[in-house]
Amino acid sequence: MIELQGLSQRFPGASGDVHALRDVSLSIAAGEVFGIIGRSGAGKSTLVRAINLLNRPSSGRVIVAGQELTALDTGALRLARREIGMIFQHFNLLSSRTVYENVALPLELAGKPKAEIAATVLPLLDLVGLSALKGRYPAQISGGQKQRVGIARALASKPKVLLSDEATSALDPETTRSILELLKQINRDLGLTIVMITHQMEVIKQVCDRVAVLEAGRVVETGRVIDVFLRPQHDVTRAMIGDVISQELPASVLKRVESRLGNGRDHVYRLAFTGEGVDQPVLAQAIRRYGLDFNILHGHIDEIQGQAFGSLAIMATGELADVKAAMEYLQAQGVVVEEFEHVV
């Protein structure tokens, strides 16, 4: 559905060009929810605005639904953009227009007749749960409701792609969850391809199928969300996952175990489980098989896209050869094993 090939973006700066994007290539499949995450200044918003050419890249190709947008003239690009909806952190509603009229605006600008506008807008208001508020003005509704208006407006032209640029970052956690559930429903019901730009790994965890991690204008990691959580490859990814699932031992636990390390018999590991592995007694089996003692130091169980995900920090006590054999056994059972390097 979306192909980004070698995108680079340079902006003039006081001391030379600023490189906002550096040779970014991504492939996003039709019907998936794809997340792009990074810290502030990583280039996320520049990248999402390159998809609909609100920012034209300095070099590279943008292909959406088989059409190369970077090769289109102004008129053809205007038509192509109708198939790409967009929602923003700030809702950009017109204060003088009602909820209904805000959603109808792009159809009015396209010259659609009133009957066709009504046939499109009313079902959209029902979809986003705002039918009862269609006559209200933006000042009379909440932030979450304003974002629902923005979503309905973005869907009015029946796009194939929806771009979401930090659409939940100004909302409280409960409202964020409701908006993410709405986007998941839209993805399921309409088969819409959604690209989520965010700095919040919690958003990625809740709604995305795959994710790309952006740092200093480059894609440093990409993959299925569950795989990225299980096996983060880049320091930036590990840090951002740590925002929602702690990857480090708490200081109180670290202090307690430090005195036992270095004796050759005690080793600290992080174990990550997913899917059916969360429910299997693999630790008990490893203890019996290799005659070890396992002390659980820290643990966390969560859910990613409906799939159970567990993380444990353990101290394994026994002969080094037996400990290593036990870790290899756990890996063979699908457990991700990582030794805490800063502890041992």
Swiss-Prot record:
<keyword id="KW-0472">Membrane</keyword>
<keyword id="KW-0547">Nucleotide-binding</keyword>
<keyword id="KW-0029">Amino-acid transport</keyword>
<dbReference type="InterPro" id="IPR045865">
    <property type="entry name" value="ACT-like_dom_sf"/>
</dbReference>
<dbReference type="InterPro" id="IPR050086">
    <property type="entry name" value="MetN_ABC_transporter-like"/>
</dbReference>
<keyword id="KW-0997">Cell inner membrane</keyword>
<dbReference type="InterPro" id="IPR003439">
    <property type="entry name" value="ABC_transporter-like_ATP-bd"/>
</dbReference>
<keyword id="KW-1003">Cell membrane</keyword>
<comment type="subunit">
    <text>The complex is composed of two ATP-binding proteins (MetN), two transmembrane proteins (MetI) and a solute-binding protein (MetQ).</text>
</comment>
<keyword id="KW-0813">Transport</keyword>
<dbReference type="InterPro" id="IPR027417">
    <property type="entry name" value="P-loop_NTPase"/>
</dbReference>
<dbReference type="GO" id="GO:0016887">
    <property type="term" value="F:ATP hydrolysis activity"/>
</dbReference>
<keyword id="KW-0067">ATP-binding</keyword>
<comment type="similarity">
    <text>Belongs to the ABC transporter superfamily. Methionine importer (TC 3.A.1.24) family.</text>
</comment>
<feature type="binding site">
    <location>
        <begin position="38"/>
        <end position="45"/>
    </location>
    <ligand>
        <name>ATP</name>
    </ligand>
</feature>
<keyword id="KW-1278">Translocase</keyword>
<dbReference type="Pfam" id="PF00005">
    <property type="entry name" value="ABC_tran"/>
</dbReference>
<protein>
    <recommendedName>
        <fullName>Methionine import ATP-binding protein MetN</fullName>
        <ecNumber>7.4.2.11</ecNumber>
    </recommendedName>
</protein>
<feature type="domain" description="ABC transporter">
    <location>
        <begin position="2"/>
        <end position="241"/>
    </location>
</feature>
<dbReference type="GO" id="GO:0005524">
    <property type="term" value="F:ATP binding"/>
</dbReference>
<dbReference type="GO" id="GO:0005886">
    <property type="term" value="C:plasma membrane"/>
</dbReference>
<comment type="function">
    <text>Part of the ABC transporter complex MetNIQ involved in methionine import. Responsible for energy coupling to the transport system.</text>
</comment>
<dbReference type="GO" id="GO:0033232">
    <property type="term" value="F:ABC-type D-methionine transporter activity"/>
</dbReference>
<dbReference type="InterPro" id="IPR003593">
    <property type="entry name" value="AAA+_ATPase"/>
</dbReference>
<dbReference type="InterPro" id="IPR017871">
    <property type="entry name" value="ABC_transporter-like_CS"/>
</dbReference>
<dbReference type="InterPro" id="IPR041701">
    <property type="entry name" value="MetN_ABC"/>
</dbReference>
<dbReference type="Pfam" id="PF09383">
    <property type="entry name" value="NIL"/>
</dbReference>
<dbReference type="InterPro" id="IPR018449">
    <property type="entry name" value="NIL_domain"/>
</dbReference>
